[in-house]
Regions:
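A short loop-to-beta-strand structural motif that recurs across blades of beta-propeller domains
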Residues: 25-27, 75-77, 126-128, 170-172
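Beta-propeller domains
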Residues: 1-24, 44-62, 73, 95, ...
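Multi-bladed beta-propeller domains
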Residues: 1, 29-53, 79-105, 114-119, ...
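Hydrophobic helix-coil surface modules that form long, contiguous segments used
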Residues: 14, 22-24, 33-43, 241, ...
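Residue-level recognition of a conserved intra-blade site in WD40 beta-propeller repeats
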Residues: 5, 57, 101-102, 151
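Serine-hydrolase catalytic core recognition
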Residues: 9, 15, 146-481
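Active-site-adjacent structural elements in folded domains
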Residues: 40-43, 47-51, 61, 93, ...
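Beta-strand C-termini and the immediately following turn/loop, strongest in propeller blades
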Residues: 13-20, 55-71, 89-90, 103, ...
Length: 481
């Protein structure tokens, strides 16, 4: 939480978290005496999610809103300024997400929620309203879609923009009861459709447990022929702090539309452990196994789609991902080497022992070991060691059978290029053939070299999944006559 200071500057509120990420305190400190008072203490095993957490100090420190997953579902709780629990604000087998607005005069909280209606995609943001002094939430945006709202200063009205990948945006002015006042704008996409653009399609499959529903999106070529068979490419991101699967209307998303035009079925699908938006049990699925947890679900989702649709060639499977998705793409082709035939792995954190320490220790787990140490006089003191072990892609590089392209920028400040270099070294030591692209001057994103990378990726997949040897030809299509 950010620091919050009372208007008289006498008290500062802050949050502190244990290194094992499973205990958190909300505290106040007296700026005159420097006395620290613990107001809220929360134990949340195996970890408290650092990205979905939320603490709001209101009314000059008299009210605190604290988001907790203590019931297995993320909801808000109202405490007074001394840390006494007053009431839950929301409850039930669904998730209360980030706060959109707070009206302190009316003591009303507006927040997004997910998964309250089993008939609607649980990843869709929908706006709810609660009085902070009692339990209960009212849904204000009932339309089936992904909602984004902007409140007017008075909090009496808000602009609601909602869409789906297969539905154009609608922009409505509503009052704070959810009543529609008027439609503000309507997009005209007639020229886009006239050019041949096709909407992607939503789908639902089962996770590898054959119980959990997974939600995905499929892109087809604009000249799609249901009588043909198409290779399939899975565009992935493992989370665990958010899911990648798009939910709102867009003309392109992470190369998916453009890649499909080469003659591929392109999908992106969720998996257990990818996001906190579906409750604690779903989100913590990957704890202790950062490398492997999303792989089985991705493979099983593709197998189901290939069985469901005769136009999908389940023997020609590719996978692409960036950052955590790059980590996942390389892990997938080395874990299931007979299933995935080609993988493009970009800027992947292939060895989380050298990535951001907090990231790995939170989502994979760190073990606290207490020991007693004696000094030269025999005095005993307690010390703590923290032990961290995580699986790396280098450990399974020897399994590679298909075609792998590694990509990194050479000045990546997020995922150090050493991750890719370690993976490359392991592949070389295992005698594996692979492609590699290092982009000079590029960081975690590829900037002006992005188009260059994009063409390299398209040619790579065309060659290894379509068998198109013309992909070895290099030319600038923007300058062709």
């Amino acid at each position: 939480m950010p620091f919050s200071v009372t208007s008289d500057s006498k008290y500062v509120f802050f949050e502190r978290t244990k290194r094992t990420w499973d205990e958190v305190d909300v505290c106040s400190v007296n700026t005159s005496t420097l006395e620290v008072k613990e107001l809220i203490h929360e134990v949340d095993k195996p970890y408290r999610d650092p990205h979905a957490r939320s603490v709001e100090v209101l009314n000059d420190g008299k009210d605190i809103l604290f988001r907790s997953e203590r019931t297995g579902w993320g909801h808000y709780y109202h405490y007074d300024g001394q840390g006494n629990l007053k009431n839950a604000i929301s409850s039930g087998p669904w998730v209360s997400g980030h706060i959109a607005a707070i009206d302190t005069l009316q003591r009303t909280v507006y927040f997004y929620g997910y998964g309250d209606d089993p008939k609607i995609n649980p990843f869709y943001y929908r706006l709810y309203k609660s009085n902070m002094d009692r339990e209960g939430a009212t849904l204000l945006t009932k339309e089936d879609g992904q909602h984004r709202v902007i409140f007017l200063k008075s909090k009496r009205y808000f602009i609601d923009t909602f869409s789906r990948v297969d539905m154009e945006p609608k922009i409505l002015l509503k009052d704070n009861t959810g009543k529609v006042i008027m439609e503000l704008a309507k997009p005209d996409l007639s020229q886009v459709y006239a050019a041949g653009w096709k909407k992607p399609e939503n789908f639902v499959v089962k996770a590898a447990d054959n119980v959990t529903d997974l939600y995905g999106v499929m892109w087809k070529p604009s000249n799609f022929d249901p009588e043909k068979k198409y290779p399939i490419i899975s565009v992935v991101y493992p989370g665990p702090y958010f899911g990648f699967v798009p939910t709102n209307f867009t003309l392109d998303d992470s190369y998916c539309t453009r890649m499909a035009q080469l003659g591929f079925i392109v999908i992106t699908v969720g998996h257990r452990g990818d996001t906190p938006m579906r409750g604690k049990a779903y989100h913590r699925y990957g704890y202790g196994n950062m490398r492997d947890y999303p792989l089985e679900d991705d493979k099983y989702a593709i197998e189901q789609l290939a069985q469901r649709h005769s136009f999908i060639d389940g023997k020609k499977v590719g996978i692409y991902g960036h950052s955590g998705g790059g980590f996942m793409a390389a892990a997938a082709i080395c874990t299931y080497p007979d299933f995935y035939k080609a993988a493009v792995s970009c800027s992947g954190n292939h060895d989380n022992s050298i990535y951001n320490r907090g990231w790995g220790e939170c989502y994979n787990g760190v073990r606290e070991v207490e020991k007693v140490v004696k000094d030269s006089l025999g005095n005993e003191t307690k010390e703590y060691e923290y032990k961290f072990r995580v699986k790396s892609n280098a450990e399974i590089a020897k399994n590679l059978k298909g075609h792998l392209m590694l990509v990194t920028g050479d000045i990546d400040k997020n995922v150090n290029p050493a991750h890719t270099y370690r993976m490359a070294q392991a592949l070389i030591e295992a005698g594996k053939d692979f492609d590699m692209l290092v982009i000079p001057g590029a960081g975690h994103g590829y900037g002006s070299a992005d188009e260059y990378f994009e063409k390299k990726m398209y040619r790579f997949f065309a060659k290894h999944l379509l068998g198109d040897t013309r992909a070895d030809y290099w030319g600038d299509i923007n300058r062709s006559k």
